[in-house]
């Protein structure tokens, strides 16, 4: 009997378990949380109460139970545990530890970009001593960030030496590494491109633009969507270098994304990569947009089913008429969650998927996501209508009765981008 072990519950865990079960695979979920707190356990055939940090105990249990596949949802910690367990047990991982390293060390990733002349933001060397001559050589404004964290954790934007000193110390306090990146602050539009990999070949699934609500922090991307301009330019001018980079990294199977900015100098710059599914869960609406099922792809890889180039979808070459969207539910307030409203109602809409991260009683931090809603539509107007419906319906309230979720309302801007993208196709 094939047995798949899912490490914890995070984005996409339930969907991966359900798909594995549809193949007749016996599914197990493990962590030290009750099923009500680790909901993938509620859909699995079996669950264990072993913390995913306890690798030795998990290895022993996997051998005893003859586990044949190990995977996880969107959790970098659990992905690293899966890599280690698969290595010990001789099981299949979609990526190697060596390739995964470039997702976790932004400094080494930038060094690899330099090696192949891929465009990246200018770096400034700052030692832990924070010497004045080093600080004086910096061209402000800059971004300061840890090499090993994602999701905007530990990041600061600095306009002078005093801010840089504090930001450097803050980044160190957040990180397990003593390496800190100080680089030119890019200003402009942001994207990430998602790729599928099969036996060493890579194919661009989609270029995803990232939009923040005006007046809120620019890194709180409330709407991530295939609605974009500059798509043909990216596909023709930037994508070949990115594919070269991913092959240099060692991306052979699975899913990988690479983040970019188009700076004020009208040049694209690579920011970072993630050898995993994206936190905005754009892989969910790709199934409707492209006919490509990321969940199926990753579960099959974990089960040892090999893919080849013929199974990859045709790469994107221009802006899509149809849309795929991931709405990340960012907060602009903090507090204890007292009430969740509208999640079930929105989930009943055809093609809409809802991933909720919080339950009543949980703490919500300011400027952190509390959930994701994804969908695909045939037209821009349908996309805008769903976003408006989410704004009206979905609420995450704190102890003061305040809705903590940022709403996206800049539809005129989105429509202009959509029209420009399609015009560029001509």
Model-identified regions with their sequence ranges:
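Short beta-strand-to-loop capping motifs
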Residues: 159, 195, 329-333, 373-379
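A conserved helix-loop-beta module that forms one wall/lid of the active-site cleft
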Residues: 87-154, 161
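Active-site "cap" helix and flanking loop/linker of ATP-utilizing ligase/carboxylase catalytic domains
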Residues: 237-257, 264, 274-334
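Short, conserved charged micro-motifs
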Residues: 56-57, 131-133, 164-165, 334-340, ...
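Internal nucleotide-binding/catalytic subdomain
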Residues: 155-268, 277
């Amino acid at each position: 009997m094939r047995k798949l072990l899912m490490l914890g519950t995070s984005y996409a865990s339930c969907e991966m378990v359900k798909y594995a079960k549809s193949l007749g695979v016996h599914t197990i979920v493990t962590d030290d949380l009750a099923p009500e707190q680790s909901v993938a356990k509620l859909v699995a055939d079996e669950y264990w109460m072993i913390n995913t940090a306890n690798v030795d105990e998990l290895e022993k249990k996997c051998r005893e139970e003859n586990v044949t596949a190990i995977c996880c949802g969107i959790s970098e910690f659990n992905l690293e545990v899966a890599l280690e367990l698969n290595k010990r047990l001789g099981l299949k991982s979609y990526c190697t530890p060596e390739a995964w390293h470039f997702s976790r060390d932004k400094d080494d990733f930038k060094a690899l970009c330099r090696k192949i002349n891929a465009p990246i933001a200018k770096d400034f060397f700052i030692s832990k001593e924070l010497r004045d001559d080093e600080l004086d050589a910096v061209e402000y404004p800059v971004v300061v960030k840890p090499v090993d964290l994602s999701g905007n954790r530990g990041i600061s934007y600095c306009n002078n030496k005093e801010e840089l000193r504090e930001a450097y110390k803050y980044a160190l306090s957040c990180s397990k590494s003593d390496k800190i990146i100080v680089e030119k602050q890019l200003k402009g539009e942001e994207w990430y491109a998602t790729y599928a990999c099969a036996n060493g070949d890579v194919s661009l699934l989609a270029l995803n633009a990232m939009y923040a609500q005006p007046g809120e922090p620019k890194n709180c991307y409330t709407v991530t969507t295939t609605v974009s301009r500059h798509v043909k330019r990216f596909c023709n001018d930037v994508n070949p270098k990115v594919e070269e980079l991913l092959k240099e990294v060692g991306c052979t199977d699975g899913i990988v994304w690479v983040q970019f900015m188009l700076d004020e100098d009208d040049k694209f710059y690579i920011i970072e990569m993630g050898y995993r599914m994206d936190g905005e869960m754009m892989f969910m609406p790709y199934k409707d947009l492209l006919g490509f099922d990321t969940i199926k792809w990753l579960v099959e890889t974990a089960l040892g089913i090999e893919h080849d180039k013929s199974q990859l979808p045709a790469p994107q070459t221009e802006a899509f008429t149809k849309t795929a969207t991931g709405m990340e539910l960012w907060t602009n307030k903090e507090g204890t969650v007292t009430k969740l409203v509208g999640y079930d109602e929105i989930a009943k809409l055809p093609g809409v998927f809802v991933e909720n991260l919080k339950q009543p009683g949980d703490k919500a931090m300011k400027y952190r996501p509390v959930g994701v809603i994804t969908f695909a539509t045939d037209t821009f107007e349908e996309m805008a209508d769903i976003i408006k419906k989410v704004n009206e319906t979905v609420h995450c309230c704190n102890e003061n009765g305040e809705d903590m979720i940022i709403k996206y309302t800049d539809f005129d801007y989105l429509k202009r981008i959509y029209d420009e993208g399609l015009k560029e196709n001509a």
